[in-house]
Amino acid sequence: MLCISNIMLEKPNKGGIMRYGKIGVATAMAVGAAVGYAVESGKWFITVIAVLAGVALLSLVKRRVDEVVEDERTVRVGERASRRTVEIFSIGAALSGAVMLALDLHTEAALALEFAVCCVLVLYLIFYGYYSFRALD
């Protein structure tokens, strides 16, 4: 920061958290609109392109953020929230699927729920094993 008499001149900020947030909201809206159009028109490849472009744009913008975006507490809260989400989804979806299968209601949906639970648990085990042997940053 450079002070000239009573006027303070600051270096222009390349990108702050607020700017990242605004671009993130705009990107989410654009991706949502593109996905809506793709579903309506039946063109699945538009969805893939829109999501990949949105992820790439957010990645580029986040690299330019100079401020601290998260601290240790934020990371720990995210870890706990993620773990509870997986636990609650797995238990709820497994029970819902089992009840639906037992009552012979919407068999395809029940099997999809059970399959989703299996996939989530397999992914959890893969990541747990990966991070068990890898040094945590």
Swiss-Prot record:
Keywords: Cell membrane, Membrane, Transmembrane, Transmembrane helix. It is found in: Cell membrane. It is a multi-pass membrane protein. InterPro entries: DUF2178_TM. One of its GO terms (cellular component) is plasma membrane. The chain crosses the membrane at residues 20-39, 44-61, 86-105, 109-131. This is Uncharacterized protein AF_1792. The lineage of its organism: Archaea, Methanobacteriati, Methanobacteriota, Archaeoglobi, Archaeoglobales.
